[in-house]
């Protein structure tokens, strides 16, 4: 069985001029995954990471204790190892420049949602960590700037997630396909378990919070009805599956075929998910696995972000299902 460490070394060897910086970042993320995995598995035995922290994040959302733990774990691991020039998190208002000699000379910045779906942890539902890595655009040797983080998603050099479920998996891409590694706690290593993952071009699963139906755009309402209608030629009706954790829903749909939708709504007209921390990394993974991702109209990876915590509607998953949803969005446009 090939380990994540072996896989990283093999891939680095394919690029003779590579100096190992990206490999070092992935190694840091591997450590973060192990630490968060350890504490999540003890969540029911301690009050230290369960429940609300009483603190609000920059979006005005109440942070769970585990949000803060995951955020601080990720941040500290990156600071200690000095593998990146800067760090931005969904849980922190501003980016952090690692203003040390090694940090200023690092080539990459990382953006992260340290713990997606954290409200589920109290009831033992799978949660995840999402990450996105870019090559900085500011001069090497200087502190990073906001422009290093405000890059369109097609400029990502790597992205992935860690899902903490019945097993812990690290799934990532560096632009050459998607591979998944399952954690073996008895050995303390991630082993290659899902090589060259491909999203089926079509599927039978649609994932959306139907409790918000009345607030959705007409195109989304019509697509939901389409999914529910009986039609032998397209093997409908489809199955509704919604966990409430982007990582978990995306992971299932990537393996089985399906579409995940978090649209705009009357209560959040620009969408609710964050472009830089959730939309871009999931879109990069989807495209690398043969799927697509859009905001209902345009390709997610082509959007030029204007601010660090910008929100976006997200339609992501099997190619044919996303295209069909886009058809409904165009046909029933409310502009």
UniProtKB/Swiss-Prot annotation:
The keyword Nucleotide-binding does not apply. The keyword Metal-binding applies. Binds 2 magnesium ions per subunit. One of its GO terms (biological process) is fructose 1,6-bisphosphate metabolic process. It is found in: Cytoplasm. Mg(2+) 1 binds at residues 90, 113, 115. Its cofactor is Mg(2+). Homotetramer. This is Fructose-1,6-bisphosphatase class 1. It comes from Histophilus somni (strain 2336). The lineage of its organism: Bacteria, Pseudomonadati, Pseudomonadota, Gammaproteobacteria, Pasteurellales.
